[in-house]
């Protein structure tokens, strides 16, 4: 839960001092910008939260996958600012943490079947979300020096 709790602040720290242009830049061709990474984690947070709620509060509700690239294409049309994306992530993460903290050990052991991955428990999602956070935080850590070193657009 430590990773889940600290990720919003890590986003803030890693984006500090970067311009809107830098947050939207693609220093590695074909890879997401920092803004897109945070948007992706925000979309994922929504999907993971729904799955966890189904596991915790419904009986035998099937869990479905999602196409991250299609969600990203839709998000790009919305033209959301980085601050709004970050605030949306923080609000959803607070709700997710509240849900996990309110769950008993028996609740966290409840399961549902994912259409791609099979049986998953609510506690599996704590680890899955943390790993997803770490993966993308490391991606931002690698991108940041490239953005700082590049000439401003």
Where are these predicted regions, by residue range?
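Short, contiguous alpha-helical
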Residues: 24-68, 97, 111-153
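A short secondary-structure junction motif
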Residues: 14, 18-21, 59, 103-106, ...
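Short acidic/polar alpha-helix capping motifs at helix-coil junctions
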Residues: 1-2, 14-17, 60-62, 74-77, ...
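A glycine-rich, hydrophobic loop/mini-helix early in the fold
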Residues: 6-29
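Acidic/histidine-rich alpha-helical segments that form the ligand environment
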Residues: 3-8, 12-14, 72-109, 129
């Amino acid at each position: 839960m430590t990773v889940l709790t600290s990720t919003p602040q890590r986003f803030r720290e890693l984006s500090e001092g970067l311009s809107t242009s830098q947050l939207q830049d693609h220093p590695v061709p074909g890879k997401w910008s920092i803004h897109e990474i945070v948007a992706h984690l925000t979309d994922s947070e929504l999907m993971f939260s729904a799955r966890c709620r189904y596991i915790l509060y419904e009986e035998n509700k099937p869990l479905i996958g999602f196409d991250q690239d299609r969600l990203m294409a839709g998000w790009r049309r919305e033209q959301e600012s980085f601050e709004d994306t970050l605030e949306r992530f923080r609000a959803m993460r607070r709700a997710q943490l509240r849900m996990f903290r309110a769950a008993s050990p028996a609740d966290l052991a409840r399961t549902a079947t994912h259409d791609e991955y099979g049986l998953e428990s609510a506690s599996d999602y704590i680890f899955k979300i943390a790993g997803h956070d770490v993966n993308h935080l490391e991606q931002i850590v690698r991108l940041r020096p490239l953005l700082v070193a590049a000439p401003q657009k």
